[in-house]
Amino acid sequence: MKKLWGGRFTKTAEEWVDEFGASIPFDQELVEEDIEGSLAHVTMLGECGILPEGDVEQIKGGLIRLLEKAKQGELKFSIAYEDIHLNIEKMLIDDIGPVGGKLHTGRSRNDQVATDMHLYLRKRVEEILGLIRGMQRALVAQAEKHVETIMPGYTHLQRAQPISFAHHLLAYFWMLERDYERFSESQKRINRSPLGAGALAGTTFPIDRHRTAELLGFADIYENSLDAVSDRDFIIEFLSNSSMLMMHLSRLAEELILWSSQEFQFIELDDAFATGSSIMPQKKNPDMAELIRGKTGRVYGHLMALLTVMKGLPLAYNKDMQEDKEGMFDTVKTVIGSLKIFTGMIETMNVRTDVMERATKQDFSNATELADYLAAKGVPFREAHEIVGKLVLHCIEQGVFLADLPLDVYKEASPLFEEDIYDALHPRTAVNRRNSAGGTGFAEVRAALAKAKQLLSTP
């Protein structure tokens, strides 16, 4: 089959070679963006007097019909035309005749595909921003219910100090806020038009690049035609931002997996986000959380793959850059799906407040309270630390907890201990005393919730 670019060639490639080089199996994802870009391009060609009005109207009519079919999923693509651009051009020519071939005037597939991807990512990043906000709202809604729910806080996965469960949830709120800021800020670089840069050097036609940028809603154009067609920074930045977002989701997924286990029993995930076993009738597996944890690795892989593709490419376009799309599409799908799943899991999980609070009374996570108690009475903290460490060792040897020790044992360790030590040892008191800025004290958590809600209400 004759290629649309085949004039210089004396023989055609074998079918298997065409299949290896074709991108249509995956870049058909860009069909709507490709047609939208073409509509802006042909409109500009008409306004600049490069194409007659009659040709422009014919081409626009054909493109609009193709766009309607694309939205209905009615277009059939062929590997013979290798990519989304040539497939659409062939369909247009079949519909309106040879005049359809004028669409490509003053344009290359190099600036065309770059434009498509800018349009595609701009839409998807907006969707991701909305989903991040949705998950943040779910976290805030759960946190509001659990300001005074006490749980063990951990370091090294060992119980460290008691904290408010709301405080723990809000830690993820602020991680997601940084993700939101990164994605939002990246739109400045995504929202820039490469259209009109041509293959690499611009075009001899008197086009108006600012006009096509305006028609497509771009804030600006690329200032250098070589940069315009060879830049994939905006995709790499998207993959990097997605990797950090998925890392945050994976960390929370790991905690939900642990908390829902028989060993913790802090939460129960809704049945809609769990599965059973084909052999063990009792099992309720946190599969959705595990999948998100697993899918994080593929997003990291896509980032490293594209960095590796781009690291040695001379200017301007190289066929290697065709490898930018599948990882981008898969990352978009993974991030959007993960955020939707996570929002549902957070909204519907059952929190076992009694188990959480009981866990804070069956360990030594209140030991810091004793050290702080002595330090507040003038004992150097390192000396206080040593005294309390010996008390903890005594408890371990006796099989009891700090709250079980009689006052005379405390007095023997330090005469500064008084009856009020037992109030300080209570987990709820320990949590509520930590009212330094950003701390887990109930007043601070409520202030943090108010700040989070105000942020969510800001357009």
UniProtKB/Swiss-Prot annotation:
Keyword match Amino-acid biosynthesis: yes
UniProt GO cellular component terms: cytosol
Superkingdom of source: Bacteria
GO biological process, one term: L-arginine biosynthetic process
Record EC number: 4.3.2.1
InterPro entries (UniProt xref): Arg_succ_lyase_C (IPR029419), Argininosuccinate_lyase (IPR009049), Fumarase/histidase_N (IPR024083), Fumarate_lyase_CS (IPR020557), Fumarate_lyase_fam (IPR000362), Fumarate_lyase_N (IPR022761), L-Aspartase-like (IPR008948)
Keyword vocabulary terms for this entry: Amino-acid biosynthesis, Arginine biosynthesis, Cytoplasm, Lyase
One annotated GO molecular function: argininosuccinate lyase activity
Subcellular localization(s) per the UniProt record: Cytoplasm
Keyword Cytoplasm recorded: yes
Protein's pathway: Amino-acid biosynthesis; L-arginine biosynthesis; L-arginine from L-ornithine and carbamoyl phosphate: step 3/3
Chemical reaction(s) catalysed: 2-(N(omega)-L-arginino)succinate = fumarate + L-arginine
Family indicated by similarity: Belongs to the lyase 1 family. Argininosuccinate lyase subfamily.
HAMAP family: Arg_succ_lyase
PANTHER family documented for this protein: ARGININOSUCCINATE LYASE
Family matches, as NCBIfam families: argH
Protein name listed in UniProt: Argininosuccinate lyase
Source organism of this protein record: Geobacillus kaustophilus (strain HTA426)
Lineage, opening ranks: Bacteria, Bacillati, Bacillota, Bacilli, Bacillales
